Every structure is written in structure tokens, then in C-alpha cells.
């Protein structure tokens, strides 16, 4: 298999809003492929199409050699998906969540423990704690363990470290690099450019369009007027009405751009 993911001419609209516009790219087996772009760029929509949760309006996409529409059941068996928001069962314990996801794929924690051991051992002392009571970093490790418990061929991570402290972010990417060494293909979306340094290649997406695909350093050079190498990343404003609160002259904007007048 030359490419484990192939996307050709994919477009998707929600009403009058076009989330994706003629998106094309390919991912090689065993690489970490980064998808970087501001909020609203289309990253989550693209991930939902590739994980068979949303249908594209136009174009074709394949994952693990399978068409995302015709062979969605096979893709769901071969792919692991970690959404941007913590989506596990808050009222179940750590162990119960992992057991539940293993059962969905007709396997057990014991059968695949070796795969998640390095990650799960860090939260195993809290296996009886409810998931809703975990810290951000521990939730992240639990979600990754659940995404891996069925031994997927490819892992989709939608902004997995957003809202997590810097130490936990580094630990998380260290775990991903180790998974890559074991042959797992990883596609990760993030607004953090310093995380993209860990990727083999990245695609820069903005307003639903792929602007460029290359190594992290070359993308930074190509789009230096837009991207900032220091931290959270985008020099262009991306604030919409739902991210701003204005009360009697007091204005607070969330995300990359915070201002109080």
C-alpha cells in the first residue's frame, strides 16, 4: 500500500458555510502527518469524514485502502479516533471506560495490554476513579488508551493537547513518537506549531483549503507572514461572535487573542 490515506477533491458544506473546498492529500504508512490551521479551518470536519462519521458532498477518500462510504465498517475496525473534546463516559471509571471500548471491538484489556501498557500504567493507580474526576492530562491518556485498545492501523487525533498543561503535552507527544516507532500511522490536528515539529510532514489548512504540504520547517518558511513559530501560532485574527463577550464596555476575547478594554 503506497498510501494509507488518500483524499481527492473532498468538499463539504453546512448550509451556506463551505467547511472544506477541494481538499487533496495523501499519507504514507508509518508517518506522523500533521494538520495545522486556525479554529474553523475545517480540521474537525475532515477528521469526521475520514473516520466515517460525516459524508462529504464531493470527492473521494480512502483509509487503509477502503472507501470511507462503501467500506465504513472496515475502516472503523482499523482506525482509532480521539476527538477534540473528551468524549468518554464521565460516570464510568477509568477501567470501565477502557473495558467498554475493548468490548466494542470484541477484545479485552488483557489481550492488548502490551500495546497500551506504557500509557495506561500512568493512570492505572486511578483505575477506579470516575473519568469525569480526572485531570486534563489523565483524561488525555485515558482517551488515547481507549483509541488504541483494538490495535488500529491508523490513529486520528483531533487537537489532542488543547487545554492541557505543557508538561502533559510533551509527555503525550513522546508517547506518539514511540507509537510511530512501532509502525503506527498517526494523523494529528493541532494549532500548536511547536508540536508540528514532531511530524514528518504537515498540511496547512485555512478556510477549508489546503494551502501547502511539506516538512514543518518548509511550511514555516513558506507561510512565515501568517504563522508564528513561537507558540500558538496564527498571526491573523480568527475571532467570531461566539468567542467574544461584551458587557458595558468590557470586552474579553478567547483563544489566541485576549483583550480586555
Q: Which residues are covered by each model-predicted region?
A:
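Conserved ABC transporter NBD signature motif
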Residues: 59-67, 75
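Conserved ABC nucleotide-binding domain
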Residues: 110-132
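Hydrophobic anchor residue at the start of the ABC signature
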Residues: 144
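Catalytic Walker B motif of ABC-type/P-loop ATPase nucleotide-binding domains
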Residues: 155-158
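ABC ATPase "signature
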Residues: 213-214
Amino acid at each position: 500500500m503506497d498510501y494509507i490515506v488518500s483524499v481527492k477533491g473532498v468538499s463539504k458544506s453546512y448550509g451556506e458555510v463551505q467547511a472544506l473546498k477541494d481538499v487533496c492529500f495523501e499519507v504514507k504508512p508509518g508517518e506522523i502527518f500533521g494538520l495545522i490551521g486556525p479554529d474553523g479551518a475545517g480540521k474537525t470536519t475532515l477528521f469526521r469524514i475520514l473516520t466515517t462519521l460525516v459524508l462529504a458532498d464531493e470527492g473521494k477518500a480512502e483509509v487503509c485502502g477502503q472507501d470511507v462510504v462503501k467500506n465504513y465498517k472496515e475502516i472503523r475496525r482499523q482506525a482509532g479516533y480521539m476527538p477534540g473534546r473528551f468524549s468518554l463516559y464521565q460516570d464510568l471509571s477509568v477501567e470501565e471506560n477502557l473495558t467498554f471500548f475493548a468490548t466494542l471491538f470484541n477484545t479485552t484489556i488483557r489481550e492488548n495490554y502490551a500495546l497500551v501498557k506504557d500509557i495506561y500504567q500512568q493512570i492505572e493507580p486511578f483505575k477506579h476513579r470516575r473519568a469525569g474526576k480526572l485531570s486534563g492530562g489523565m483524561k488525555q491518556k485515558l482517551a488515547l488508551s481507549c483509541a488504541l485498545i483494538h490495535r488500529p492501523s491508523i490513529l486520528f487525533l483531533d487537537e489532542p493537547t488543547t487545554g492541557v498543561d505543557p508538561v502533559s503535552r510533551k509527555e503525550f507527544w513522546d508517547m506518539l513518537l514511540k507509537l510511530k516507532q512501532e509502525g503506527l500511522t498517526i494523523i494529528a490536528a493541532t494549532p500548536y506549531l511547536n508540536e508540528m515539529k514532531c511530524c514528518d510532514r504537515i498540511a496547512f489548512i485555512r478556510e477549508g483549503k489546503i494551502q501547502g504540504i511539506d516538512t514543518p520547517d518548509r511550511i514555516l518558511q513558506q507561510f512565515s507572514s501568517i504563522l508564528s513559530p513561537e507558540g500558538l501560532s496564527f498571526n491573523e485574527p480568527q475571532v467570531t461572535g461566539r468567542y467574544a463577550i461584551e458587557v458595558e464596555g468590557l470586552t474579553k476575547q478567547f483563544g489566541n487573542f485576549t483583550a480586555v478594554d
